[in-house]
Amino acid sequence: MAVGIRLKLAGVNAEQFDALEAGVDARNDHPDGLIFHASGPVEGGWGVLDFWESREQFDRFSEERIGPNVRAAGVTSAPEIHEFPVHEYLAR
């Protein structure tokens, strides 16, 4: 079953998130299991909403691709992570 992952990166701004995204390079090397990704500013930091085929695929991506790039992007706090089961999604 697909899972939704909602992240809040406290204190992170657009410049830091863009640096993290550049290091992760998901646009050119699509993560296995990623269905949908969106991000933008939220109160107190940066928000991310992802849909993944499984929590395990998100965890692997986070460990292998996000983790190594966090410090280089200037991100110093751990994200708040909320998971929810995806009952349905529509895509164009």
Where is each model-derived feature located?
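Mid-chain, well-packed structural core segment of small domains
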Residues: N69-V70
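Short S/T/G/P-rich N-terminal loop/turn motif that feeds into the first structured element of a domain
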Residues: M1-L49, E53-R65, G74-R92
